[in-house]
């Protein structure tokens, strides 16, 4: 198994500069911190950039989760992340989950669901950086991937906020972070508990990142072919 991990790590190192080079820029803030860049992009192009951004975040989060699992999580413990003690922090959020629910919600709620998910993960991913730094043998490629995702999630939030303003004419929209579950991170757990908690975070974020991607692609489909969006 370690040979496979090493090989995947080698490929990740080789491909990482390429992924950074081809990643879509979505930094809406200027040097003064004002979101003055994205408003000058057309709604269609902005949505395309956001989707490409979300696709890459989803892909890198999946790679990070798989690498972490192979390196640190013994096989008998991999199913425990689905138990009550390791519930996803976004489980209680009013996010549509079934296909029928997703199909029925409005464009506004699709965007609001994406924004809610993005904002709910910004602080937990910052926390994840501090815990991964304590691992003695965490490879740089894992640390770099999680750091990149954490940074790009903030850019994705900025893009979604501007898109909401463009599509829904909600110029006074403000962003708020969901901190309802962050207090559980105040006490540092022992190493095994920390591994399982980090594994849960990565696994849950992987699923939510995929959900963001699906919502955004459905929104794009509704803009182009409203009656044939499955």
Swiss-Prot record:
Pfam families: Hormone_1
PROSITE patterns with a match to the protein in the record: SOMATOTROPIN_1, SOMATOTROPIN_2
Cysteine-cysteine disulfides: 28-38, 88-204, 221-229
Keywords of the record: Disulfide bond, Glycoprotein, Hormone, Secreted, Signal
Annotated signal peptide: 1-23
A Gene Ontology biological process term: growth hormone receptor signaling pathway
InterPro entries linked: 4_helix_cytokine-like_core, Somatotropin/Prolactin, Somatotropin_CS
Name of the featured protein: Somatolactin
Species per Swiss-Prot/TrEMBL record: Solea senegalensis (Senegalese sole)
